[in-house]
């Protein structure tokens, strides 16, 4: 069920005009309870520059995905690329953002460590897409004025344009 739902969500994501136009995309290597991105990363790595986050202390460092052979198990049991560090944040066109919950205003609830809260302000011009299963779309997520909202939420077969 998770694999099928993930495939449907990611099919909607890749059909979005902002994704189609993007050259450099920040994805994430999913955990067992998240939308499964493993096959999606491999699929798009031959057509677009794919970046994946690596946990370094209290921050996320971005690295270029070069293939499954260059992955290692990092913090929290997450597979992370060992390739080149990427620091040209202005070149990132699109970001797929994981979360525990999202609301229709684009607010996101993460896992509580603040990694994306610290990363996203460095990438203001990229389209930010929260991707989630239907049960993760909730009425309201608590948000502070400094929280970065998602531009779109991709759930099931469709996108919800985040708005106030």
Question: Across the structure, where does each feature detected by a protein language model lie?
Answer:
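Active-site beta-strand/loop microenvironment that shapes enzyme catalytic pockets
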Residues: 91-128
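N-terminal active-site beta-alpha-beta segment that forms phosphate/nucleotide-binding
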Residues: 1-90
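Conserved small/polar residues in nucleotide/adenosyl-binding loops
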Residues: 158-163
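Redox-cofactor binding/interface segments in oxidoreductases and associated redox assembly factors
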Residues: 27, 97-98, 155
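Structured adenosyl-cofactor binding patch, chiefly the S-adenosyl-L-methionine
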Residues: 116, 121-155
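Short, structured patches in soluble enzyme cores that scaffold and shape functional sites
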Residues: 54, 64, 80, 132-135, ...
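Conserved acidic residues
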Residues: 23, 93, 151
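Short glycine-/acidic-enriched loop or helix-start segments at secondary-structure transitions
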Residues: 36-39, 62, 105-108, 140-141
